[in-house]
């Protein structure tokens, strides 16, 4: 039985999930980035800081035991478009690369936007549409 780890570090939420490839069940952990009262968002440097603190905490919750990780997926940018870049995605990318190297797992990247589409397909049981 193997598992796929997914990591997303957007400008709003730190997220990680484990997909059990045997039964396609998902366990996930996520935490909103803290935005001060009256503000509308975060500077990228603040988002990077919060992801750096939150992602290890979430991974600790997710990994309640040792898992055979066969692949690691992560979001590298907001969209699959030339010039689409936000520093906050580097946190997830770096953790994904480290886990992939440590586990000898395949490494796959996608955009945050594609992640939303894949989550919708998974949620409605339509992964066969891929």
What are these model-predicted stretches?
Residues 1-130:
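Short acidic/glycine-rich loops and adjacent helix/strand connectors
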């Amino acid at each position: 039985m193997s598992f796929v780890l997914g990591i997303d570090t957007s400008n709003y939420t730190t997220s990680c999930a484990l997909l059990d490839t045997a039964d396609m069940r998902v366990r996930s952990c996520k935490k909103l980035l803290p935005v001060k009262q009256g503000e509308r968002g975060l500077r990228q440097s603040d988002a990077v800081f919060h992801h750096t603190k939150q992602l290890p905490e979430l991974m600790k919750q997710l990994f309640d035991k040792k898992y055979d990780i066969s692949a690691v997926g992560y979001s590298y940018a907001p969209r699959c478009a030339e010039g689409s870049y936000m520093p906050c995605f580097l946190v997830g990318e770096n953790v994904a690369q480290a886990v992939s190297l440590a586990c000898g797992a395949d490494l796959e990247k996608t955009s945050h936007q594609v992640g939303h589409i894949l989550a919708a397909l998974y949620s409605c049981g339509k992964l066969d549409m891929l």
